[in-house]
Amino acid sequence: YPKDNTSGCTAEACSLRDHKAALAHKGYAILGVSKDSAVSHQKFIEKQGLNFDLIADTDTTLLQALGAWGEKKMCGKTCIGTLRTTYLVNEEGVITHIFAPKQIKTKDHAEQILAIID
């Protein structure tokens, strides 16, 4: 996810928070990754009551390895940054589905995931 405490990221995180039990029942855990610091993540977790871990990838190594760092458009301008992407990974560590940036509906993202895994 791109950034702690922004409207889209907050909506997405809260959707996942609210559906954590349903996702766990299907065998899925939730991890968030952004380039924000661990301190920023902790504040975000506390402010939103998040019930899952956030990884601080401040040098973007993991984001780049996942293909979730690259060129995007923001406010009509091209920039380099985090590409909002979700990977569904099974118990064997195999990616079974990828939600590309334009496919993610932040407010309803947990429902999108549940529809795929049901």
Where are these regions (language model features)?
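Chalcogenol-based redox active-site neighborhoods
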Residues: 1-118
